[in-house]
Amino acid sequence: RYGTFPAGSIGWVISRERFMQGAEKWLSNLKLRASYGLVGSDKISDSNDDRFAYLQFFQGGDGYSFGVNEFGNGYSGLKEGNFANPNLTWEKARKLNVGLDASFFNERLTFSADYFFEHRYDIITNLSDGNKLGYPGIVGKDAPFINSGIVDNQGIDFEIGWNGNIGEDFRYYIKPNFTFARNKIKFMNEVSYENEWRANTGKRIDEYFVYEFDHFVYDQAEADKLNAMNGGTGFQPWGKLYPGDVVYK
């Protein structure tokens, strides 16, 4: 299958402009750059069986009976090897990057800063995974791969470097960097929850839900008080509390 993914970039070397004359004594390079483009991915999984998920195939199986031969052995037939999706297409992402590069003192001090934004859509996903809308087990096959899902990711990246010599035989280069990024699931084809906070849409990828620590049970008197709550079922649903146990909010 074919796809077209255009992209482009521009740059402005500010240090070469006339108004920067005289700065070359301390400024080696100053460049502003930006790029924007559409990229595609056809990676579905690490399994070779999924490489052609848009094509239906069949395989031999003994799940269907077509009678027996003269020796009493059953004839095996064909069964669906997968449920294909002929409309499956590329997973796409629109990417924006804006950056600034600078170097000083004959390239000894370098600096780079970037802002990046990615809007990923038509995400290839299998509805049978996790809490997505899939087929019931009685079907005997996983739901087909589809293009469903939108995720935004953005962040900043900084790095600064210094290089120099110690004597004639030793050269060093120091280059620390800092990156901060946040993603957000804008849409996921998932089941409906009675408790909306369990939904993945609107949250970060692989965001975990955990109980928040409040305090430890001080003594038996407090434990008895907590265990008597909610009509005797206890403050927490997973068993009685004892001195030293954790109490969650």
Regions found by a protein language model. Give the residues of each.
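Short coil/turn segments at secondary-structure boundaries
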Residues: 188-190, 224-227
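Extracellular/periplasmic, surface-exposed regions of secreted and cell-surface proteins
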Residues: 1-212
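Structural flexibility/helix-modulation signal
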Residues: 227-229, 233
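Helix N-terminus capping/helix-initiation residues
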Residues: 13, 202, 219-220, 244
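Alpha-helix N-cap recognition
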Residues: 218-221, 225, 249
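Glycine-centered loop/turn motifs
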Residues: 201-208, 234-244
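Short, small/polar-rich motifs associated with maturation and membrane association
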Residues: 141, 170-172, 238, 242, ...
